[in-house]
Amino acid sequence: MNPASPDFSFETAALAGGALHVAGVDEVGRGPLAGPVTAAAVIMDPGNIPPGLNDSKRLTGAVRERLHDWLLSHARVAIAHASVDEIDSLNILRASHLAMERAVAELSPDHALIDGNMIPRNLGCGAQAIVKGDARSLSIAAASIVAKVTRDRIMVDLAQQYPGYGWERNAGYPTKTHLQALLDFGVTPVHRRSFGPVHNILCQGKSVTS
């Protein structure tokens, strides 16, 4: 049985409750050892939903790219990040919430639908946390696509600056290639020093790549 596709029911309920602008919010990049965490907030027009819109994890790279470009042209979209320094100083959960707060602040919606089971504390609007929201809400699905494509592109650019870690393929996640490269080449300025595998390399006295 195919999993159900996301729909507009959460947005419709919020609009019926008096909200004028409802944003779906998602983030990507909690698990990688390198790079920022990226969040997107998207306000969709209920009368203009692109076919095939779904959780980014259910889509091919080509479809994600196409939908990303469509959303930037046809929806209200905000993208924000929390840096590696912020991740290391705050912790990854708080940093991911900070990125979501920044994205929401750019759109100033009346209500936000947040992927997951926690609501960031400084959203500035009413909000609902939806577990597996990227597979249930079209607005969150849209945000998941924008966030993933944006961050993947950032990691491709960083891979040009720091070759050998495979970020153009692994997006900074701890793949075998990435972990071996840490041993071979050391830690870069865009690695998250608070994350175990990176911290362990530093404790071994591995030189930091400039």
What are these language model-derived features?
Residues 1-210:
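RNase H-like, Mg2+-dependent phosphodiesterase core
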